[in-house]
């Protein structure tokens, strides 16, 4: 709206300035026509002087509105290009076939190298991540991984087995005739044990995550989903495209997927989780979505170790990390990681 007002105001000032200059310069026009004719001659019952002013104002409004609309189109297009650049997507797409002004094209041509530089920095971040993946910190990660494996084994051999035994005992007790209030308490206890088993499986997934080993990212996620479908009551759906992704990036994305699913199993109280992986040419899209209870993103993002860990992993590979969640509306996590197009071309 501000663009319209500025354009209309500018046109009015310009036209009136030209008209005033013309009237002052041409004294003959002022004496003969302006005073003698315009006040006495009428058009549609309106003095010519007033009619001409109304026509000029109307023309200014029409022309100014058209110009303001076109300028607003240019600004919106540039804004969309900047947003594409920030997200790591291709710039220069003109879906609405807008006629671009020379100034807009000049600004776009300035934006292109900035987008290329941003993409280069993202890829450099990925390369550094791949290099760090094979450096000395792998030893530290190995020590931590071994400790996590040890804790996971102990939990599986002790607590997990005890929960399973308790579940079997409760199932057997349910088959017998019980008097009140035991007949009402046993189902409650059984539900609590089942929830504890689900929590334990999520914790074991967090402590002892499956590794990709020689698998691709797509294959690893599919195997993870198939394994979960056998062990958890929640419905797990996947839509996975299998394509080449650098090893260091694959590992980070796989860990993000595991962390997101683990959080879903432990906290969402949902009945379904969907895992999607797509190749969008310039970038890949990883999406994990559930139909659970949701949460306040601003509060949880600072408090939850899991969410912060996922965001940090995404930033390490130059990816964007977005969470959309509302109470009673589920949660959606999206990770967009740029793909190295030059490497893909070389592989071809």
Curated annotation (Swiss-Prot):
**According to its UniProt record, where is this protein located?**
Cell membrane
Cleavable signal peptide: none
Q: Which reaction does it catalyse?
A: ATP + protein L-histidine = ADP + protein N-phospho-L-histidine
Topology within the bilayer:
Multi-pass membrane protein
CDD domains in the record, alphabetically? Answer: HATPase_UhpB-NarQ-NarX-like (cd16917)
Record's keyword terms, sorted: ATP-binding, Cell membrane, Kinase, Membrane, Nucleotide-binding, Phosphoprotein, Transferase, Transmembrane, Transmembrane helix, Two-component regulatory system
General function of this protein: Member of the two-component regulatory system VraS/VraR involved in the control of the cell wall peptidoglycan biosynthesis. Probably activates VraR by phosphorylation.
| Protein name per the record | Sensor protein VraS
Protein source organism: Staphylococcus haemolyticus (strain JCSC1435)
As recorded in Swiss-Prot or TrEMBL, the protein's gene is named: vraS
């Amino acid at each position: 709206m501000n663009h319209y007002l500025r354009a209309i105001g500018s046109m009015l000032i310009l036209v009136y300035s030209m008209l005033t200059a013309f009237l002052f310069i041409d004294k003959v026009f002022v004496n003969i026509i302006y005073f003698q004719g315009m006040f006495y001659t009428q058009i549609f019952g309106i003095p010519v002087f007033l009619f001409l002013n109304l026509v000029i104002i109307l023309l200014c409004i029409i022309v100014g509105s058209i110009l303001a609309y076109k300028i607003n189109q240019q600004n919106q297009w540039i804004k969309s290009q900047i947003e594409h650049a920030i997200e790591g997507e291709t710039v220069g797409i003109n879906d609405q076939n807008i006629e671009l002004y020379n100034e807009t094209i000049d600004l776009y041509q300035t934006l292109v190298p900035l987008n290329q530089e941003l993409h280069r920095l993202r890829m450099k971040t990925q390369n550094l991540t791949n290099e760090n993946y094979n450096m000395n910190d792998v030893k530290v990660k190995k020590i931590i991984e071994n400790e996590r494996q040890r804790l996971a084994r102990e939990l599986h051999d002790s607590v997990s087995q005890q929960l399973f035994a308790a579940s079997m005992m409760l199932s057997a007790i349910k088959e017998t005739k019980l008097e009140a209030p035991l007949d009402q308490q046993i189902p409650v206890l059984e539900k609590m044990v089942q929830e504890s088993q689900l929590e334990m499986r999520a914790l074991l997934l967090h402590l002892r995550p499956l590794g990709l080993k020689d698998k691709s990212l797509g294959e690893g996620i599919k195997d993870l989903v198939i394994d979960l479908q056998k062990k958890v009551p929640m419905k797990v759906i996947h839509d996975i495209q299998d394509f080449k992704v650098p090893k260091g990036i694959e590992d980070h994305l796989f860990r993000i997927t595991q962390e997101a699913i683990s959080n879903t199993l432990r906290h969402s109280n949902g009945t379904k989780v969907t895992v999607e992986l797509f190749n969008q040419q310039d970038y890949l899209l990883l999406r994990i979505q559930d139909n659970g209870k949701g949460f306040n993103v601003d509060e949880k993002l600072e408090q939850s170790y899991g969410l912060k860990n996922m965001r940090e992993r995404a930033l390490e590979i130059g990816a964007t990390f977005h969470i959309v969640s509302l109470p009673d509306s589920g949660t959606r996590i999206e990770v967009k990681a740029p793909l190295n197009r030059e490497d893909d071309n070389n592989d071809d």
